Swiss-Prot record:
Species of origin: Burkholderia pseudomallei (strain 668)
GO aspect biological process, one term: glutaminyl-tRNAGln biosynthesis via transamidation
Taxonomic placement: Bacteria, Pseudomonadati, Pseudomonadota, Betaproteobacteria, Burkholderiales
Cross-referenced NCBIfam families: gatB, PRK05477.1-2, PRK05477.1-4, PRK05477.1-5
Keywords, sorted A to Z: ATP-binding, Ligase, Nucleotide-binding, Protein biosynthesis
Domain of life: Bacteria
Pfam families reported for this sequence: GatB_N, GatB_Yqey
Classification via InterPro entries: Asn/Gln-tRNA_amidoTrfase_suB/E, Asn/Gln-tRNA_Trfase_suB/E_cat, Asn/Gln_amidotransferase, Asn/Gln_tRNA_amidoTrase-B-like, GatB, GatB_C_1, GatB_Yqey_C_2, Gln-tRNA_amidoTrfase_suB_CS
Subunit structure: Heterotrimer of A, B and C subunits.
Record protein name field: Aspartyl/glutamyl-tRNA(Asn/Gln) amidotransferase subunit B
Known function: Allows the formation of correctly charged Asn-tRNA(Asn) or Gln-tRNA(Gln) through the transamidation of misacylated Asp-tRNA(Asn) or Glu-tRNA(Gln) in organisms which lack either or both of asparaginyl-tRNA or glutaminyl-tRNA synthetases. The reaction takes place in the presence of glutamine and ATP through an activated phospho-Asp-tRNA(Asn) or phospho-Glu-tRNA(Gln).
Amino acid sequence: MTQWEVVIGLETHAQLSTVSKIFSGASTQFGAQPNTQACPVDLALPGVLPVLNRGAVERAIRFGLAIGATVAPRSVFARKNYFYPDLPKGYQISQYEIPVVQGGQITIQVPANEKAGKQAYSKTVNLTRAHLEEDAGKSLHEDFAGMTGIDLNRAGTPLLEIVTEPEMRSAAEAVAYAKALHGLVMWLGICDGNMQEGSFRCDANVSVRPVGQEKFGTRAEIKNLNSFRFLEDAINYEVRRQIELIEDGGEVVQETRLYDPDKRETRSMRSKEDAHDYRYFPDPDLMPLVIGADWIARVKGEMPELPAAMQQRFVEQYGVSAYDAGVLTSTKAMAEYFEALVAKAGAANAKLAANWLMGDVSSQLNRDGIDIDACPVSAAQLALVLQRIADGTISNKIAKEIFVTIWDEKAADEGAADRIIEAKGLKQISDTGALEAIIDEVLAANAKSVEEFRAGKDKAFNALVGQAMKATKGKANPQQVNELLKKKLG
């Protein structure tokens, strides 16, 4: 039986976070009434000329530097000719032979798949190019009975199309790459990453070939996948479809396909064009884009610290594990919250801060369906909670209760933790005399557990600790309780 190898390449359209469009001054704001953000340039009225948005170019440079690519000192805009109702000019301004960003790579972390018996691993995906282009408008098929409406608000919106080499070998790798890229463009501040609004969408080129064969199989391109789940489902379906088709004696046709999320299948949209079908030629209305070394140096100087460098710094500066550093730098907002937390709580509490962020804080964020930048507990408020754990004022259990109280109250005061501790009398009991008296009562009331412990049953000791903590309503210092119990039990 033939063993098949999957070959995947992704083309990702990232909408650049400029206020105006790539060749006009019209707004890029999402959600406006149809055709209220389309100026004469976007409408392709006679006599208008495009003017390149400098901000879009700088965002492309920033991306190129982040992935270790070559930023072309000279690149050219080209006309991509095709007809579609939502493309007013009859062509799209893009880049073809000389893109602004050439090469580069992104390292991805592919998670383990226990069902398939596969362990987690890392892989470097090479990029072919990233080029600037304008978006088309939008066809509205459901708003008018028997007719199609055209909304040109998106026409001219700046895009960075990021193209990989066909190096991914599974849907899991493709999703891992898409997530890594998504995180990077948001980290760099060049794209808001909003997939629901179409700011980040992927086209997947999928083919299969017998294992060991060098020649690529015929590919199908699945267009406009705007969620990671859709990307994974679409690729998996397409792989199955192609293998079944070939094994049944058929041939895969080069075509463009759409993914139907309701049926969880791809369906044919049109035959796939080759580059020559678009009759690319340099746009005579736009000068070649020249990017000098001084411009690149200035953009580089304004770039944020990149995730990989920050991960290494967290390991060295704060003593957290490489895994923890990866989680803490999963988003820029998470990394900034962690650094603000450590700055307030003290470097000595860095590991405690990391544990809380990855544990209780992340749990609450998931519960409420929000991101860290919308966390109702500020870094300063949480830092005070951690300081009170560290100085023995409260136990970790009580700290969790205080944290949830601050979260639910949406308290604004930085000293909320101290206020709640005083108001509810939550200070940890650390007085040895008071604890000894409580433990004596616990031992007297739990003679059976004492006997079991002395008979060698360690679980009985944990039961006694639990009774002591219950007697103090969780306010006893757990470490002291353990020490005093061991002392009294001999």
